Amino acid sequence: VMTKRNLQLWLSYIVILLPMSYGVVNYAALPAKMAIHFNLDNQPNGMAAKLLVVVGFPIMMMAFQLICVGVTRLNANHKAPAPRFEQMIIWIVPVLSSVIYATTISYNLDHQLDIWRIAVSLIAFIFMAIGNYLPTISANQYAQMHRGGHTIRPMIWRRVRYWLGYTLVGGGILLLLSIVTTAWVSVSLMGIIVAALVIMSLYGTLARN
Protein backbone atom coordinates (compact mmCIF):
# COMPACT_ATOMS: atom_id res chain seq x y z
CA VAL A 1 0.00 0.00 0.00
CA MET A 2 1.40 3.39 -1.00
CA THR A 3 1.85 5.68 1.99
CA LYS A 4 0.90 9.34 1.99
CA ARG A 5 4.58 10.26 1.96
CA ASN A 6 5.34 8.07 -1.06
CA LEU A 7 2.32 9.46 -2.90
CA GLN A 8 3.52 13.01 -2.27
CA LEU A 9 6.99 12.01 -3.42
CA TRP A 10 5.72 10.66 -6.74
CA LEU A 11 3.51 13.72 -7.20
CA SER A 12 6.54 15.94 -6.60
CA TYR A 13 8.42 14.26 -9.45
CA ILE A 14 5.42 14.81 -11.73
CA VAL A 15 5.32 18.49 -10.75
CA ILE A 16 9.02 18.80 -11.63
CA LEU A 17 8.65 17.12 -15.03
CA LEU A 18 5.26 18.50 -16.09
CA PRO A 19 6.48 22.02 -17.03
CA MET A 20 8.88 20.39 -19.50
CA SER A 21 5.91 20.06 -21.86
CA TYR A 22 5.88 23.88 -22.09
CA GLY A 23 9.48 23.88 -23.28
CA VAL A 24 9.02 20.95 -25.67
CA VAL A 25 5.91 22.46 -27.30
CA ASN A 26 7.74 25.77 -27.85
CA TYR A 27 11.12 24.21 -28.64
CA ALA A 28 11.29 25.49 -32.23
CA ALA A 29 10.53 29.06 -31.14
CA LEU A 30 13.27 29.15 -28.52
CA PRO A 31 16.74 30.56 -29.33
CA ALA A 32 19.72 28.21 -29.65
CA LYS A 33 21.33 29.93 -26.65
CA MET A 34 18.94 30.69 -23.83
CA ALA A 35 19.27 33.25 -21.04
CA ILE A 36 19.36 31.48 -17.67
CA HIS A 37 20.85 34.08 -15.32
CA PHE A 38 20.05 37.76 -14.86
CA ASN A 39 21.39 40.84 -13.07
CA LEU A 40 19.37 43.22 -10.91
CA ASP A 41 18.39 45.21 -14.01
CA ASN A 42 16.68 42.16 -15.54
CA GLN A 43 19.45 41.85 -18.11
CA PRO A 44 20.71 38.33 -18.93
CA ASN A 45 24.33 37.64 -17.95
CA GLY A 46 24.39 33.86 -18.32
CA MET A 47 23.50 31.64 -21.28
CA ALA A 48 23.07 27.91 -21.91
CA ALA A 49 22.28 25.64 -24.86
CA LYS A 50 18.58 25.16 -25.60
CA LEU A 51 18.55 21.38 -25.17
CA LEU A 52 20.35 21.66 -21.84
CA VAL A 53 17.71 24.08 -20.54
CA VAL A 54 14.57 22.46 -21.96
CA VAL A 55 15.46 18.85 -21.10
CA GLY A 56 18.51 19.01 -18.85
CA PHE A 57 17.13 21.39 -16.21
CA PRO A 58 14.12 19.23 -15.19
CA ILE A 59 16.34 16.13 -15.07
CA MET A 60 18.87 18.00 -12.92
CA MET A 61 16.09 19.12 -10.56
CA MET A 62 14.80 15.53 -10.39
CA ALA A 63 18.27 14.39 -9.32
CA PHE A 64 18.45 17.24 -6.78
CA GLN A 65 15.04 16.23 -5.41
CA LEU A 66 16.19 12.62 -5.04
CA ILE A 67 19.28 13.75 -3.13
CA CYS A 68 17.35 16.12 -0.83
CA VAL A 69 14.67 13.56 -0.02
CA GLY A 70 17.21 10.75 0.35
CA VAL A 71 19.43 12.70 2.75
CA THR A 72 16.40 13.81 4.77
CA ARG A 73 15.10 10.22 5.04
CA LEU A 74 18.55 8.91 5.96
CA ASN A 75 18.85 11.56 8.65
CA ALA A 76 15.40 10.64 9.99
CA ASN A 77 16.28 6.94 10.11
CA HIS A 78 19.54 7.47 11.99
CA LYS A 79 18.60 10.45 14.12
CA ALA A 80 15.28 12.05 14.98
CA PRO A 81 12.30 11.81 12.60
CA ALA A 82 10.83 15.15 11.54
CA PRO A 83 7.71 14.50 9.44
CA ARG A 84 6.84 18.16 8.85
CA PHE A 85 10.38 18.92 7.73
CA GLU A 86 10.30 15.99 5.30
CA GLN A 87 7.00 17.19 3.90
CA MET A 88 8.37 20.69 3.44
CA ILE A 89 11.49 19.37 1.67
CA ILE A 90 9.36 17.23 -0.66
CA TRP A 91 7.54 20.30 -2.01
CA ILE A 92 10.11 23.10 -1.95
CA VAL A 93 12.18 21.76 -4.86
CA PRO A 94 9.19 21.04 -7.17
CA VAL A 95 7.72 24.50 -6.59
CA LEU A 96 11.06 26.22 -7.20
CA SER A 97 11.79 24.06 -10.24
CA SER A 98 8.39 24.69 -11.84
CA VAL A 99 8.50 28.46 -11.37
CA ILE A 100 12.13 28.80 -12.50
CA TYR A 101 11.55 26.60 -15.56
CA ALA A 102 8.35 28.35 -16.65
CA THR A 103 9.94 31.77 -16.10
CA THR A 104 13.05 30.85 -18.11
CA ILE A 105 11.05 29.49 -21.05
CA SER A 106 8.68 32.49 -21.02
CA TYR A 107 11.53 35.00 -20.97
CA ASN A 108 13.24 33.30 -23.89
CA LEU A 109 9.97 33.42 -25.82
CA ASP A 110 10.23 37.22 -25.49
CA HIS A 111 7.53 37.56 -22.85
CA GLN A 112 8.02 40.59 -20.64
CA LEU A 113 8.86 39.43 -17.12
CA ASP A 114 10.29 41.06 -13.99
CA ILE A 115 12.88 38.43 -13.17
CA TRP A 116 14.05 39.94 -9.90
CA ARG A 117 10.49 40.19 -8.57
CA ILE A 118 9.93 36.52 -9.34
CA ALA A 119 13.28 35.60 -7.73
CA VAL A 120 12.54 37.63 -4.59
CA SER A 121 9.09 36.04 -4.34
CA LEU A 122 10.67 32.57 -4.47
CA ILE A 123 13.15 33.47 -1.72
CA ALA A 124 10.28 34.86 0.36
CA PHE A 125 8.41 31.59 -0.15
CA ILE A 126 11.41 29.58 1.11
CA PHE A 127 11.87 31.86 4.13
CA MET A 128 8.21 31.57 5.14
CA ALA A 129 8.11 27.79 4.61
CA ILE A 130 11.17 27.23 6.82
CA GLY A 131 10.02 29.83 9.36
CA ASN A 132 6.65 28.12 9.67
CA TYR A 133 8.37 24.80 10.33
CA LEU A 134 11.09 25.83 12.83
CA PRO A 135 8.89 26.39 15.92
CA THR A 136 7.74 22.74 15.71
CA ILE A 137 11.26 21.38 16.37
CA SER A 138 11.91 20.30 19.95
CA ALA A 139 15.25 20.79 21.69
CA ASN A 140 15.98 17.06 21.41
CA GLN A 141 15.19 17.01 17.68
CA TYR A 142 17.43 20.02 17.15
CA ALA A 143 20.29 18.34 19.02
CA GLN A 144 19.83 15.07 17.11
CA MET A 145 19.87 16.89 13.76
CA HIS A 146 23.38 18.19 14.49
CA ARG A 147 26.52 16.09 14.55
CA GLY A 148 27.56 14.92 17.95
CA GLY A 149 24.04 15.26 19.35
CA HIS A 150 25.05 18.04 21.77
CA THR A 151 22.30 18.92 24.18
CA ILE A 152 20.68 22.33 24.17
CA ARG A 153 18.70 23.69 27.06
CA PRO A 154 14.97 23.52 26.21
CA MET A 155 14.32 27.07 27.41
CA ILE A 156 17.11 28.44 25.21
CA TRP A 157 15.95 26.55 22.14
CA ARG A 158 12.30 27.47 22.74
CA ARG A 159 13.31 31.11 22.64
CA VAL A 160 15.67 30.81 19.67
CA ARG A 161 13.33 28.73 17.49
CA TYR A 162 10.59 31.35 17.77
CA TRP A 163 13.03 34.16 17.08
CA LEU A 164 14.22 32.35 13.96
CA GLY A 165 10.70 31.43 12.90
CA TYR A 166 9.31 34.94 13.32
CA THR A 167 12.32 36.46 11.56
CA LEU A 168 11.95 34.13 8.58
CA VAL A 169 8.18 34.52 8.25
CA GLY A 170 8.29 38.26 8.90
CA GLY A 171 11.28 38.64 6.59
CA GLY A 172 9.45 36.70 3.89
CA ILE A 173 6.44 38.99 4.15
CA LEU A 174 8.67 42.08 4.00
CA LEU A 175 10.45 40.66 0.95
CA LEU A 176 7.10 40.19 -0.79
CA LEU A 177 6.22 43.79 0.01
CA SER A 178 9.63 44.96 -1.25
CA ILE A 179 8.89 43.84 -4.81
CA VAL A 180 6.83 47.01 -5.27
CA THR A 181 9.98 49.07 -4.62
CA THR A 182 13.42 48.52 -6.20
CA ALA A 183 15.77 45.56 -6.49
CA TRP A 184 18.30 47.18 -4.15
CA VAL A 185 15.70 47.46 -1.37
CA SER A 186 15.07 43.71 -1.66
CA VAL A 187 18.79 42.92 -1.67
CA SER A 188 19.42 45.12 1.38
CA LEU A 189 16.49 43.53 3.20
CA MET A 190 17.81 40.04 2.44
CA GLY A 191 21.19 41.06 3.85
CA ILE A 192 19.58 42.28 7.08
CA ILE A 193 17.49 39.11 7.43
CA VAL A 194 20.48 36.81 6.88
CA ALA A 195 22.60 38.82 9.36
CA ALA A 196 19.83 38.58 11.97
CA LEU A 197 19.54 34.81 11.43
CA VAL A 198 23.30 34.36 11.83
CA ILE A 199 23.32 36.35 15.09
CA MET A 200 20.40 34.35 16.51
CA SER A 201 22.00 31.05 15.48
CA LEU A 202 25.27 32.05 17.14
CA TYR A 203 23.40 32.94 20.30
CA GLY A 204 21.73 29.52 20.32
CA THR A 205 25.06 27.77 19.71
CA LEU A 206 26.95 29.67 22.41
CA ALA A 207 24.12 29.52 24.94
CA ARG A 208 23.98 25.72 24.81
CA ASN A 209 27.62 25.32 25.90
PLM regions and their residue ranges:
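Select subsegments of transmembrane alpha-helices in polytopic membrane proteins
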Residues: 8-12, 53-60, 68, 86-95, ...
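Alpha-helical transmembrane segments
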Residues: 12-15, 46-61, 112-131
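Active-site and channel-lining beta-strand-loop segments
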Residues: 23-54, 141-153
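Membrane-water interface of transmembrane alpha-helices
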Residues: 25-30, 62-74, 128-146, 207-208
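Ordered, amphipathic secondary-structure segments that act as subunit-interaction surfaces
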Residues: 69-117
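Membrane-helix boundary/juxtamembrane motif in polytopic membrane proteins
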Residues: 119, 142-167
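Small-residue-rich transmembrane alpha-helices that serve as helix-helix interface/gating elements
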Residues: 122, 186-200
